[in-house]
A protein has these predicted regions:
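Short coil/linker segments at helix-helix boundaries
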Residues: 42, 48-52, 73-74, 78, ...
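Structural signature of tandem alpha-helical TPR/SEL1-like repeats
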Residues: 62-65, 95-103, 137-148, 174-188, ...
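TPR alpha-solenoid repeat register
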Residues: 84, 117-118, 162, 199, ...
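Residue at a conserved register position within TPR or TPR-like alpha-solenoid repeats
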Residues: 92, 124-125, 170, 207, ...
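Structural marker of alpha-solenoid helical repeat scaffolds
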Residues: 111, 155-156, 191-193, 225-227, ...
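Residue-level recognition of tetratricopeptide repeat
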Residues: 114-115, 159, 193-196, 213, ...
Length: 262
């Protein structure tokens, strides 16, 4: 989990479109929703998340976590504390609680603020965002992921991967006062990095989500041409080809899609 990687999120663009082109929302209502979300995030902490998560854990896992937390509290050497925090982050991640794992990764980044440390924290938080069944956890993770990626960008502004990951988070959980912010960031990234396979991949997926299938074909084909080691792209291409009535290419993409998930 500590290898810096591209954050892969399944964009909930239907929600974004509902907010953007649906019924007109009064500015006061938007401000109130934004205030409510901020309050929820403020009242949600790692400690609160741990209380609820521990109710579902085995006695063995509880004992291990308790001992690690005791070691974390009693140690004064920052390097030793960092090693314990890494173990706690890894354990919570393995248990299926990426938001809590992200909080410990965030702790590490605060102690040793490097671009990589903040990127790891943001990526870890990002893994909790698709957990839509718990809005509090999702909003908590998204808010902390945004902060982590912004910190990473401030330390390494030339690194486009953190900018991409930030855009993906903002597309997945759009700010209520600026729902198109993530999409605009993706388009800006494409303008600044026109031959970037990963950016084109996500723009192609976004185009499919929004029904712009011809645009999706162009973006995904260009992405694949730039990087042919993207097995997951064929599943998207199949859909784009089908919707644009390119049946022969859709069939070929479908076969490659099936092979990629075997």
């Amino acid at each position: 989990m500590y290898k810096v990687q591209y954050l892969v999120l399944f964009l909930s663009v239907l929600l974004l479109l509902t907010m953007y082109v649906g019924c007109e929302t009064k500015a006061s209502d938007v401000k109130e929703m934004t205030k409510t979300r901020a309050l929820v995030v403020e009242n949600t902490t790692r400690e609160v998340l741990e209380i609820y998560a521990k109710k579902k854990l085995s006695s063995t896992d509880l004992l291990l976590l308790e001992n690690l937390n005791k070691d974390l509290d009693k140690n004064t050497d920052l390097n030793k504390k960092a090693e314990i925090a890494r173990k706690l982050s890894a354990k919570w991640y393995d248990l299926g609680y990426p938001a809590i794992a992200g909080a410990y990764a965030e702790m590490l980044a605060e102690w040793f603020p490097t671009p990589e440390a903040w990127s790891i924290a943001g990526t870890t938080f990002g893994q909790a965002i698709p957990q839509k069944e718990d809005a509090k956890v999702r909003d908590f993770a998204a808010a902390h992921a945004v902060t982590a990626f912004e910190n990473a960008i401030s330390l390494a502004p030339e690194d486009w991967t953190n900018k991409l990951n930030l855009a993906l988070v903002l597309t997945e959980v759009p700010p209520q006062d600026n729902p198109m912010k993530g999409v605009k960031m993706l388009l800006d990234l494409d303008a600044n990095y026109p031959d970037n396979a990963r950016i084109l991949f996500h723009l192609g997926r976004l185009a499919i989500q929004t029904g712009q299938f011809e645009k999706a074909v162009v973006r995904l084909e260009k992405s694949l041409k730039l990087d042919n080691n993207q097995p997951q792209i064929y599943c998207l291409l199949e859909r784009a080809y089908r919707e644009t009535s390119i049946s022969d290419l859709a069939d070929k993409a479908a076969e490659k899609c099936r092979n990629s998930i075997k």
